[in-house]
């Protein structure tokens, strides 16, 4: 089956960098050097890494949202990982920093999003980078500008661990920027989410069940639609959109997860009441 590529993207997975103050201080230092040298360019005001380009519609947001959460919950942190930013270079019309350390994250995001049936990544090879500025056509044609950019020095590392402020976001191309960040559709903290308290007692009661009849007995009358397919869909909605429910069902009850996804009971009669003998 041919792979569909986002060669005409309309969204991207964003890794914002504004919250890393030490990096931003050095990043802005590079931008100041460009302006001080008189290089005609448009400065990037929302430093970030584009981890994957997407060709999706609003009805795909939920699927991509869940894929991002699955990537985060499947991460093997250890002591964390480092993102390394190296000397500026010219990529197309942009002045960018070379970025290393997020290749595996890029691959995971693309694979998980594609598994949801959504279009991710482009046919050309993905190159990790962080844009500093965009050159005008006139500036790009001036040899002195190119020589100056190639002479600029930059070397910085960010350590990403469960307590760092790293986030993964869905951003629409052309989204507004404010205070160094893009307007987002979805934004998730990447840290390990140690939350063991259910948001409601009802979700706590049904977590782990894979029989709709038993779920209905645990909940109050009217909590679920009478139609079985509609009831499973409601449970699936909670599974995909409630982070506590998602994490605990994902980790502790594969049967319930499959039931939600298939809108069907997987209990095989195991939850039926035993017949009392005379």
Swiss-Prot record:
InterPro entries listed in its UniProt record: Coronavirus_NS2A, NS2A-like
UniProt similarity note: Belongs to the coronaviruses ns2a protein family.
This protein's name: Non-structural protein 2a
Organism listed in the record: Bovine coronavirus (strain Mebus) (BCoV)
């Amino acid at each position: 089956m041919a792979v569909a590529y986002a060669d005409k993207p309309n969204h991207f997975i964003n890794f914002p960098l504004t919250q890393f103050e030490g990096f931003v201080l050095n990043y802005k230092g590079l931008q100041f050097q460009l302006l001080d040298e008189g290089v005609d360019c448009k400065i990037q005001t929302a430093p970030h890494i584009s981890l994957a380009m997407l060709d999706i519609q609003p009805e795909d947001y939920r699927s991509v949202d869940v894929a991002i959460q699955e990537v985060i919950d499947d991460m093997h942190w250890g002591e964390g990982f480092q993102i390394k930013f190296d000397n500026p270079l010219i990529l197309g019309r942009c002045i960018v920093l070379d970025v290393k350390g997020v290749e595996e994250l890029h691959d995971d995001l693309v694979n998980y999003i594609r598994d949801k049936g959504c279009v991710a990544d482009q046919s050309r090879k993905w190159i990790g980078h962080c844009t500093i500025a965009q050159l005008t056509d006139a500036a790009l044609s001036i040899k002195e500008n190119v020589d100056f950019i190639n002479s600029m020095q930059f070397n910085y590392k960010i350590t990403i661990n469960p307590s760092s402020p790293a986030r993964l976001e869905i951003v629409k191309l052309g989204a507004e920027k404010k205070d160094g960040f893009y307007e987002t559709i979805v934004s998730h903290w990447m840290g390990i989410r140690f939350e063991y308290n259910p948001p409601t007692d009802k979700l706590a009661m049904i977590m782990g069940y894979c029989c709709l009849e038993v779920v209905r007995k645990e909940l109050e009358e009217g909590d679920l639609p009478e139609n079985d397919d509609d009831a499973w869909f409601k449970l699936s909605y909670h599974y995909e959109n409630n982070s506590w429910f998602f994490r605990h069902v994902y980790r502790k009850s594969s049967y319930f997860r499959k039931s939600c996804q298939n809108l069907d009971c997987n209990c095989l009669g195991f939850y039926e009441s035993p017949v009392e003998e005379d």
